[in-house]
Amino acid sequence: MTYETSVLEAERVTVQPKKIWMTAFILCFLILLADGVDLAFLAYSLTSIKAEFNLTTVQAGALGSWSLVGGVIGGLIGGWACDRFGRVKVIVFYMILASSLSCTLGFVESYHQFLIIRSIAAIGLGSLYIACNTLMSEYVPTKYRTTVLAALMTGFTLGSLCATLLAGWIIPEYGWRMLYWITICPIVLAFLLYFLVPEPDSWLRSRELKRQEAASKVKVKKENPYKVILKDKNHRWIFLLWILSAGALQFGYAGLSNWLPAYLESDLGISFKAMTGYMVGTFMIMIFAKIVAGILADRFGRRALFAFGTMGTALFLPIVIYFNTPTNILYLMLMFGFLYGMPFAINATYMTESFPTSIRGTAVGGAFNIGRIGAVFAPLTIGYFAHGGSIGTGLLVMAGAYFICGLIPALFIRDRLYDPQKAD
């Protein structure tokens, strides 16, 4: 690259950054919205699928479990691929994969066909969270990073709401297959991203540094990215801490999201219609909370707000369980929803700023998705307590997980260790 070319490239980066990252944000927001819709479709279509294929409860549950396994694999591979091939390319590839295979689910003729295709599609769906957040963290200025990434995460929550509305309209009128046929529509977002958004400058510079090292007289041996992470004492320590924190966060979140509606309905005796209204209200306040948390985290720091959201959730959940009445449960749920929505708004920024560009995708994807294994056991844990007592007892275990999740980074992980807009 000549000096003149370098100057022109630098000018392009400084003149158009806002236009580029705004375009990237809109497309990534819609991609995560589609991701949230697709993931939620399984829950809403499960009863219809179970009836059509004459499935047992165990077989029906296996669809969700294998989807989760696929998501973990996708997150691990996707994080590595982001560092190896580029953030934009990975999002494009996995979006096409997920949309194509999810659409194919509308044509399956057996349970095993559905299980296999859904598991592979989940690999694509699982990678998009890491890839989109990594891309945006490297485009958005530090001053606004948490606010923008928090707004990005509202797309996923909004996707769950959209899935509720779409399933309620489509399944009674057209059947569950139509639900999956329409998942081909978001594939257009992949092509728009490919043509409108270039790879982040920090990733391009990081790759160029590696090429220069390879071209030098010193022979550079390619290493497994996980080996690179574990070899460095500081990277290894932060990586292991985030695995523990992410595991506790997803353990608590999975347990609450799966069992909270059942708790309201069975333990508190709330009607299904009223329970649905409470959950919609909770989702809406979560969206608001994510935006507020992002703004406050940019102003006061990621560490403090993440601890407040996670530990606040942990401390407020017993209040919901032990001090609810028919007249105050709505207000308690809204206050709980605000705290419950905060951690995921800050988590992505906090994690991406904990690692350098050269290993960011691998480290964040690895920590988050190894931690996701904890989510597999959360519904079973609450089910165990519910079998011998009440769902509320199991929810208290989730509160403990949230407290641990916030305590670990509060004690050991500093704010803004690395700037995602720099090569390293």
Question: What would you call each of these model-derived segments?
Answer:
Residues 42-43, 233-290:
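Extracytoplasmic gate region of multi-pass secondary transporters
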